[in-house]
Amino acid sequence: MGLMTGGLERRAKRALDRQLDYQRAKAAKVKGHEDQLIASMMAHSKAIRDRIEAVKPIAQDARVLEVGCGAHGLIFFFGAGEGIGVDPLADHYRTLFPAWQSRAETIAVGGETLPFDDASFDVVLCDNVVDHALSPRKILEEIARVLKPGGTLYFEVNVHHGFYHAAATAHAAWRAIGLPFEITPFADHTVHLTLGAARALFEGLPLRALSEFDDVDEVKRTGPKRVRHAGDALKKLFFKNARYEVIAVKL
């Protein structure tokens, strides 16, 4: 195993460990107030479904998969005929958030190795997931494989100025050789994608974009509202956390 490959696997595991710690703390915080979070989840799921259906209708009996459903994914209130979510931490989330996790079948597996037959789903959702995973491209390949011809993909990921990719690579290098200094935004992600790199994930796949959106120009224009620390100051120079969204059809 090469240094970079081993480092990537360690980053992916570290990102999962940090996410689980965060969600455990969140579960304790929202206990007894789940209704507020459920209302937010319902609104987000409806907004995304409306965005998809403005481009391509979803059948009432559609079989829907969410890759990286996480603790509060779209699938739980998406209104699917059959809804399935996959996430490496799914077994933990069923225990932490029983109020809604039971609304869909969830399977503890990463998006790089989906345990489904080819052409199994009418709709696949992947909402802000791939930059936390071991292989963003492999996830897109698997999504294309399990989508039925004519099926719909909803994909969203954060994109950033190229500065953050370079900084994340440097951070990964010193972590790989054992230096203990850890920067939180880089520890929570395996990769910081530029807009070009996010688009390149789709190259050569049997997917045709029906709708493509990004808010890079808006994020560049507005920047952070307040400068609270050095990271916010950097965002004024190098934009961070712009949205890139694709709604695509399987050819």
Which positions does each model-derived feature cover?
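Class I SAM-dependent methyltransferase Rossmann-like catalytic core
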Residues: 2-57
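A short glycine-rich, Lys/Arg-flanked "PGG" loop and its adjoining helix->strand segment in the class I
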Residues: 137-152
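Conserved class I S-adenosyl-L-methionine
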Residues: 154-181
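A short acidic, Gly/Pro-enriched loop at the edge of an enzyme's catalytic core
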Residues: 109-124
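Core SAM-dependent methyltransferase catalytic element
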Residues: 203-207, 211-213, 218-251
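Short alpha-helix
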Residues: 184-206, 210-212
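A short SAM/SAH-binding and catalytic strip from SAM-dependent methyltransferases
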Residues: 123-134
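Class I SAM-dependent methyltransferase SAM/SAH-binding core
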Residues: 65, 69-113
